[in-house]
Amino acid sequence: MSRPRKRLAGTSGSDKGLSGKRTKTENSGEALAKVEDSNPQKTSATKNCLKNLSSHWLMKSEPESRLEKGVDVKFSIEDLKAQPKQTTCWDGVRNYQARNFLRAMKLGEEAFFYHSNCKEPGIAGLMKIVKEAYPDHTQFEKNNPHYDPSSKEDNPKWSMVDVQFVRMMKRFIPLAELKSYHQAHKATGGPLKNMVLFTRQRLSIQPLTQEEFDFVLSLEEKEPS
């Protein structure tokens, strides 16, 4: 598989442990508040809770050129489509909570491909997880902007998953539109009232509830607000 330089390192620009079973309507923002924040010393209880956090995701990447340590980290949904079998590894995540979300992903789960840190951020398409978490090779590559000299091959810190393009959204769903629904839903109790995209906006890997995922998909059929 080719190894394009890409991805946000776990946190992004300002565009931005659970017990028992989660119900489909449990809010991802509320769930996140119960998960330890960016701490490498996760307890086994917290790790087990993360596994039940979500089965839908939002994953951010930068569609416009930006040099990081001399390397262009641009990677858009069009770049994903151009990969062999429209599949690639989602590398470069360097935030513990985002990494733990990667480790919680299961084969076949769907994720929104979100264009971030660009002129018009928003949801561009859908992809699916085709390989569960395994060590991120870029942490060991000295010339890679995501190289981590503190990570050892016999005990790697960072993980990645493989993703495959599913389809483009029927229309691009911009951040501004999602934000307008989020603000309205905070008052009415609607599906996006605590969407992590707004409550923890700097996180590059974000869980979605079933309700949030379904609502965002429904926006494809509506005229832009």
Curated annotation (Swiss-Prot):
Statement: the UniProt record of this protein carries the keyword Phosphoprotein: yes
Key words of the record: Nucleus, Phosphoprotein
GO CC terms in record: nucleus
Annotated localization: Nucleus
SUPFAM superfamilies: PUA domain-like
Record PTM text: Phosphorylated.
Predominant subcellular localization, coarse grouping: nucleus
Pfam family, one: EVE
Motif Nuclear localization signal: where in chain: 5-10
Domain of life, source organism: Eukaryota
Record region (Disordered): 1-47
Compositionally biased intervals (Basic and acidic residues): 23-39
Record bears the keyword Nucleus: yes
InterPro entries with a match to the protein in the record: 5hmC_binding, EVE_domain, PUA-like_sf, THYN1-like_EVE
Task of the protein: Specifically binds 5-hydroxymethylcytosine (5hmC), suggesting that it acts as a specific reader of 5hmC.
Protein name, UniProt field: Thymocyte nuclear protein 1
Species: Homo sapiens
